[in-house]
């Protein structure tokens, strides 16, 4: 399912993720979710929410939190899920931010072991748009990686961990060289954390 603009309201996200999707999966299913747009970080806690088309940074009731997304995925009888987030992030306005507050990406709790998070921008800042690629910089590098560039060991299969590692490196390099500032993606779970979800094949070429 593809949700865009006026068809990407909070009610649409709820309907697709919490009502439609559970009817489509079984224990062998791998779910892929990509969200591109804006997000908001709670100033006091660092909790991250996605902003559907009908929301603003102050309309808390129309935001869709990463915690809610994780919980909806954890309830599914699936093998694994890969979540790709290309978000420009801002703090909730009108509230005093704690010193050094950072987005809370590490989602604790049930289902953590079967969800791979590929986050395009780990800090509170605008994510870069790549004009030449007509996508956000992170999304462009993800697509390039899926096209074969992320096959780091040249075995014809791209794993989720390979894809995120490749994309992170390319975004870091391009942001520094072309824009003069940082945009650092994040992969959760990270390398060496023993998570099987990092070994999930996301593309094959033979």
Which residues are covered by each model-predicted region?
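Cysteine endopeptidase catalytic domains of the caspase/legumain-like
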Residues: 1-206
């Amino acid at each position: 399912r593809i949700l865009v603009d006026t068809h990407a309201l909070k009610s649409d996200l709820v309907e697709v993720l919490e009502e439609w999707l559970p009817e489509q999966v079984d224990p062998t299913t791998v779910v892929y979710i990509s969200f591109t747009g804006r997000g908001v970080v709670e100033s006091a806690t660092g909790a991250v929410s996605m902003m559907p088309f009908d929301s603003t940074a102050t309309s808390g009731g129309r935001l869709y939190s990463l915690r809610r997304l994780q919980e909806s995925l954890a309830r599914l009888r699936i093998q694994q899920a890969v979540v790709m987030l290309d978000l420009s992030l801002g703090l909730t306005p009108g509230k005093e931010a704690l010193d050094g507050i950072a987005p809370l990406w590490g989602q604790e709790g049930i289902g953590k072991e079967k969800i791979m998070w590929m986050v395009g921008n780990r800090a509170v800042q605008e994510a870069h748009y790549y004009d030449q690629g007509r996508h956000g910089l992170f999304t462009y590098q993800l697509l390039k990686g899926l096209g074969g560039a992320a096959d780091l060991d040249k075995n014809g299969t791209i794993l989720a961990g390979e894809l995120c590692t490749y994309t992170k490196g390319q975004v870091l390099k391009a942001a520094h060289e072309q824009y003069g500032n940082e945009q650092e993606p994040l992969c959760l779970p990270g390398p060496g954390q023993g998570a099987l979800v990092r070994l999930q094949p996301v593309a094959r070429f033979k």
